[in-house]
Amino acid sequence: MVSTTSLKTTKSEDIFAAAQKLMPGGVSSPVRAFKSVGGQPIVFDHVKGAYIWDVDGNQYIDYVGTWGPAICGHAHPEVIAALHDALDRGTSFGAPCLLENVLAEMVIDAVPSIEMVRFVNSGTEACMSVLRLMRAFTGRDKIIKFQGCYHGHADMFLVQAGSGVATLGLPDSPGVPKTTTANTLTAPYNDLEAVKALFAENPDEIAGVILEPVVGNSGFVVPDGGFLQGLRELTNEYGALLVFDEVMTGFRLSYGGAQEKFGVTPDLTTLGKVIGGGLPVGAYGGRKDIMSMVAPAGPMYQAGTLSGNPLAMTAGIKTLELLQKPGTYNQLEQITQQLSEGLLKIAKEAGHQVCGGYIGAMFGLFFTEGPVRNYDDAKKSDLAKFGRFHRGMLEKGVYLAPSQFEAGFTSLAHTSEDIEKTLAAAKDVLSNL
């Protein structure tokens, strides 16, 4: 059994105890509470590059990357310098600014599906807005989403949502009326026949299909060959829209996201995380004829006080500039391959049933023989073993996502030496689970 007592976390424990009296569960987002892995959550003090430090002075190699945005590494000096310059001009205007144009052009140039874009403040907000847009453009009410795909915490999407909902063991959430989710149809991810059946049963009623093209909120699940293309063909056939939620995969699997990687272009795309460079941001965009429905150009209303604020735009612009440098994605892929293949090899040699994989700067490891093709497969994982593995790695200075149902992330700041240290820690932990 891996020790869970050697890591000094006295200050973290004290701060978390106080936090529980101030905030529900002591956190601002449920997965941070470590409910699915056991033990006390770590309270962080500062971050730099591939590393994080907690309030007790412990240092960790980080594979959470603030849940995806930190693809260039934490506190990248060029991003920080750009933000310092922007701060001198103010934190928010509540009015148009040139920086919005700059980031919009960069996003449009990068993402195949996006001809126009609207900036918002989070991935949840982007998905809420795109849902309204799907309905406004098609005049239809029903949507299809996939079990285990997470599109934020809006009521309509909290059906078989994976991610933090799966971590809590809840099928959805109290407080969501049945009438709100009545128009949300669900299918297993990677099951094209199930989607065909839903279209056949609901002709002329489905506004569109939304999915994570590579699932990161049931762990790490990749599409079967032909699945994404099959969805493209089905939505075309039925006059419905195809929406890729690339909040997690955008600019992480490749510069043009999953749609560039797999060669399938949706009608609309949601973005977040990376495009804000670590600041709160979201975006949705797509075909010009669809985006022209958005107010004030069209009748579909959506607004936001801090949308397009200069700090988020500045961090996003500098982050994308860094990602444009030659060799960036080859470097990310090599680091992630070294980590993912190393973890699988070590775990199997230690006698554990595992499966997993990687694309770009995103990876996953399941404690089940697999293959994992959908949410039901992911739920077969040995959650207790994952919890012990997570705690063991934490003891050895490696911070992984505190849930089996979350993907992991690498960054440009991770080195081959970091990966070797991680694999050495994993070998020790896995041999003693």
Swiss-Prot record:
Residues carrying N6-(pyridoxal phosphate)lysine: K273
Subcellular location field: Cytoplasm
Cofactor(s) for this UniProt protein: pyridoxal 5'-phosphate
Catalytic activity: (S)-4-amino-5-oxopentanoate = 5-aminolevulinate
Enzyme class: isomerase
GO biological process entries: chlorophyll biosynthetic process; protoporphyrinogen IX biosynthetic process
UniProt entry keywords in alphabetical sequence: Chlorophyll biosynthesis, Cytoplasm, Isomerase, Porphyrin biosynthesis, Pyridoxal phosphate
Cellular component per GO, a single term: cytoplasm
Entry keyword annotation includes Transcription: no
GO molecular function: glutamate-1-semialdehyde 2,1-aminomutase activity; pyridoxal phosphate binding; transaminase activity
Keyword Lyase: no
Primary location group: cytoplasm
Matching InterPro entries: 4pyrrol_synth_GluAld_NH2Trfase (IPR004639), Aminotrans_3 (IPR005814), Aminotrans_3_PPA_site (IPR049704), PyrdxlP-dep_Trfase (IPR015424), PyrdxlP-dep_Trfase_major (IPR015421), PyrdxlP-dep_Trfase_small (IPR015422)
SUPFAM superfamilies per UniProt: PLP-dependent transferases
Pathway: Porphyrin-containing compound metabolism; protoporphyrin-IX biosynthesis; 5-aminolevulinate from L-glutamyl-tRNA(Glu): step 2/2; Porphyrin-containing compound metabolism; chlorophyll biosynthesis
Pfam families from the UniProt entry: Aminotran_3
EC number in record: 5.4.3.8
Annotated PANTHER family: GLUTAMATE-1-SEMIALDEHYDE 2,1-AMINOMUTASE, GLUTAMATE-1-SEMIALDEHYDE 2,1-AMINOMUTASE 1, CHLOROPLASTIC-RELATED
HAMAP family: HemL_aminotrans_3
Protein family per UniProt: Belongs to the class-III pyridoxal-phosphate-dependent aminotransferase family. HemL subfamily.
Subunit note: Homodimer.
Protein name (Swiss-Prot/TrEMBL): Glutamate-1-semialdehyde 2,1-aminomutase
Protein source organism: Crocosphaera subtropica (strain ATCC 51142 / BH68)
